[in-house]
């Protein structure tokens, strides 16, 4: 028997009934970014491939419009 209980992954967007991911919803987008600004893969988050593609497009659009930084804040 395993020592640790692994939580089952589920798609948050399917569970909440979200049809499309909006690039202006920054709080949702930030949940799927690492502290360095990289997009977290679906094998880690459990999102379905349909929503992972929408998420990627929304993050890239938000980055282009300067709503989200491309990387973390570097101290130079």
Curated annotation (Swiss-Prot):
This is Small ribosomal subunit protein bS18. Part of the 30S ribosomal subunit. Forms a tight heterodimer with protein bS6. GO terms for molecular function: small ribosomal subunit rRNA binding; structural constituent of ribosome. PROSITE patterns: RIBOSOMAL_S18. It comes from Xylella fastidiosa (strain Temecula1 / ATCC 700964). It comes from the Bacteria. Pfam families: Ribosomal_S18. SUPFAM superfamilies: Ribosomal protein S18 (SSF46911). One of its GO terms (cellular component) is cytosolic small ribosomal subunit. GO terms for biological process: translation. Belongs to the bacterial ribosomal protein bS18 family. Keywords: Ribonucleoprotein, Ribosomal protein, RNA-binding, rRNA-binding. Disulfide bonds: none annotated. Binds as a heterodimer with protein bS6 to the central domain of the 16S rRNA, where it helps stabilize the platform of the 30S subunit. The keyword Transcription does not apply.
């Amino acid at each position: 028997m395993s020592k640790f209980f692994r939580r089952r992954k589920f798609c948050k967007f399917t569970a909440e009934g979200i049809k499309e991911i909006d690039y202006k919803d920054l709080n949702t987008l930030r949940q799927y970014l690492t502290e360095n600004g990289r997009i977290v893969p679906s094998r880690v988050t459990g999102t379905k491939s349909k929503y992972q593609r929408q998420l990627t497009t929304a993050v890239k659009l938000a980055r282009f419009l300067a709503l989200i930084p491309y990387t973390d804040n570097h101290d130079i």
